């Protein structure tokens, strides 16, 4: 069984200090998608969440799957007072027939203005 890596972030002048990661890794029939943050960092939690979820869709598509195949999601937000606004966008985006197991936590982001980051695991049929 091979491991397929997509969207490998390498060190360059504009992202110096960031980790070298693969945003999407597929092993067997499971895809792991991480480091999904707003880029550029603009707007409120709703704007950033919508931007991040569009990127999730892009990465899932790249791996040959979609949000109906999500198994789990981990969400980090900058402040729990943003939880309801984040969820309003999440609930519009998620496949209501196939919601993943999900956790939402708060964190201090290292990038100024960043309000949300998402990591998901999905089946890859």
List each model region and its residues.
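N-terminal presequence-like segments and the immediate start of the first folded domain
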Residues: 1-71, 77-125
């Amino acid at each position: 069984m091979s491991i397929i890596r997509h969207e490998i972030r390498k060190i360059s002048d504009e992202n110096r200090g960031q980790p070298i990661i693969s945003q999407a890794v597929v092993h067997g029939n499971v895809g792991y998608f991480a480091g999904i943050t707003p880029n550029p960092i603009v707007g409120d939690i709703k704007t950033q969440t919508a931007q991040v979820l569009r990127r999730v869709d892009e990465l899932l598509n790249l791996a040959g799957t979609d949000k109906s195949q999500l198994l789990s999601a981990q969400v980090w937000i900058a402040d729990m007072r943003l939880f309801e606004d984040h969820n309003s966008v999440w609930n519009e985006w998620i496949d209501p027939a196939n919601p993943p197991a999900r956790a939402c936590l708060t964190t201090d982001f290292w990038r100024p203005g960043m309000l949300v980051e998402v990591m998901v695991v999905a089946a890859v049929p």
